[in-house]
Amino acid sequence: MTATLERRESISLWERFCSWITSTENRLYIGWFGVLMIPTLLTATTCYIIAFIAAPPVDIDGIREPVAGSLLYGNNIISGAVIPSSNAIGVHFYPVWEAASVDEWLYNGGPYQLIVLHFLLGVASYMGREWELSYRLGMRPWIFVAFSAPVAAASAVFLVYPIGQGSFSDGMPLGISGTFNFMLVFQAEHNILMHPFHMAGVAGVFGGSLFSAMHGSLVTSSLIRETSEVESTNYGYKFGQEEETYNIVAAHGYFGRLIFQYASFNNSRALHFFLAAWPVVRIWLTALGVTTMAFNLNGFNFNQSVVDSQGRVINTWADIINRADLGMEVMHERNAHNFPLDLAAGEVLPVAVSAPAVHA
């Protein structure tokens, strides 16, 4: 009798690590994008929490007038924020080793850059991880495509806009009231409400909410009952079942009669593609709009008032918007400049043609 001994091939530590990283059997999929995502998001989150609680005031305008944003310096959850990097830094890369000391780094708002850049790397890696997991499971890649919309929006306000404006101090502060301040100043300087891409984004967000509510309520209202009247309808559903869980024909008939026939989808794939594409495409457009306004290609501007035959101004809604924009522009960075750019850049008007003669 001949005995055959098979020699087991030893698997290296690196191969075992690669197998574990790319395994779809893990409770949470890691993936190669996850190797980048985990440290960057942990770094951004840790720095954000510490800065929101305890960061010292930041000289955001670069004029030696620090602005406090942390809880320990008198703010609350609503007013608190991580203040953007100083205007004195501009768009220079400002890691902690570029400063003379940690105190200087904190004074110039270094944590803002650290948080924002790690956050953007992290969410981009999360997006890549969605594609990677879909690929390994044999799924189509549309989940990652949909998530690209919020990634594009975040990149626009945190990275592209500061680069276009020439300073990270123009980026969105990392806090509730700071976000609102950013929105008001953005409107004042770029008239974003009159930009067609922003209008598309508003329609995408509100329309997406409406369509999501309509779809969820229609599906929930047309579930196929597999249980008795005394049991919950939900008990009739088995996870992974092949049978339809709701009656799309009934939902289509209901909605077609509620609005009109062609307002309703009778194809489930077309319906779900529309539900995904409507907000995603429009948020892409909004991010593109912010990108164009970063380089001062602004919303529609109606600076010329409507006048009658005698030259008197006939006030329109555009005049009200312009006046509100000027007011907001005057209010922000009040100590950095005395007049908004729209006024300061105008033609100089003589106050007096000649000085009066003074007789002693």
UniProtKB/Swiss-Prot annotation:
Chain positions of site Cleavage: A344, A345
Residues holding [CaMn4O5] cluster: D170, E189, H332, E333, D342, A344
Membrane topology: Multi-pass membrane protein
Cellular compartment(s): Plastid, Chloroplast thylakoid membrane
Residues annotated as transmembrane: 29-46, 118-133, 142-156, 197-218, 274-288
Site positions (Tyrosine radical intermediate): Y161
Residues engaged in binding a quinone: H215, S264, F265
PROSITE patterns, alphabetized: REACTION_CENTER
GO biological process: photosynthetic electron transport in photosystem II; response to herbicide
Annotated residues for binding of pheophytin a: Y126
Enzyme Commission code(s) on record: 1.10.3.9
Gene3D superfamilies in UniProt: Photosystem II protein D1-like (1.20.85.10)
PTM comment, free text: Tyr-161 forms a radical intermediate that is referred to as redox-active TyrZ, YZ or Y-Z. C-terminally processed by CTPA; processing is essential to allow assembly of the oxygen-evolving complex and thus photosynthetic growth.
Positions of the pro-segment in this chain: 345-360
Keyword Nucleotide-binding in annotation: no
Subunit structure: PSII is composed of 1 copy each of membrane proteins PsbA, PsbB, PsbC, PsbD, PsbE, PsbF, PsbH, PsbI, PsbJ, PsbK, PsbL, PsbM, PsbT, PsbX, PsbY, PsbZ, Psb30/Ycf12, at least 3 peripheral proteins of the oxygen-evolving complex and a large number of cofactors. It forms dimeric complexes.
Name of the molecule in the record: Photosystem II protein D1
